[in-house]
């Protein structure tokens, strides 16, 4: 059974807060970041792992043992493995992708970093990326990591998302705005 997104986000946020604070106290944030990266990669690559976290056919004990085995095989920190086992015993593994996202955000914020999702019609050159990164850093006052995607449908320009803010300078959005203006006039 699928949970509403807000419930999943809330659950993930609580687990993320606990894990982040424990790792911060133990001065183990770099290790936690490695665990997050490893789990994220494993989720991307393994259909079996995705099935384990989403499928209701696995009982609490089975899921806990399976995710514990995964954590041990991946040599994750004890705290991460124990959290995954706890999540399995509480039938909360379905929030793992949201948990990883929350942890990634908290770690980046702690390091003074922010991720900008940039969509362009064509791949940006190294020079363009450097200029954009420098400009965004000046705007937000933090180190900016650019996650670039290409979408030819925007025709030209950029769409930049940083957190909840979005700057849309795409030709597509300008054409849509012009079309809406013309509808109002006519």
Swiss-Prot record:
Keywords attached to this entry: ATP synthesis, Cell inner membrane, Cell membrane, CF(1), Hydrogen ion transport, Ion transport, Membrane, Transport
Hydrolase among keywords: no
One GO cellular component term noted in the UniProt record for this chain: proton-transporting ATP synthase complex
Protein location: Cell inner membrane
NCBIfam families: ATP_synt_delta, PRK05758.2-2, PRK05758.3-2
Function per UniProt: F(1)F(0) ATP synthase produces ATP from ADP in the presence of a proton or sodium gradient. F-type ATPases consist of two structural domains, F(1) containing the extramembraneous catalytic core and F(0) containing the membrane proton channel, linked together by a central stalk and a peripheral stalk. During catalysis, ATP synthesis in the catalytic domain of F(1) is coupled via a rotary mechanism of the central stalk subunits to proton translocation.
Family, similarity comment: Belongs to the ATPase delta chain family.
Protein name (record): ATP synthase subunit delta
The species this protein was found in: Jannaschia sp. (strain CCS1)
Gene it is expressed from: atpH
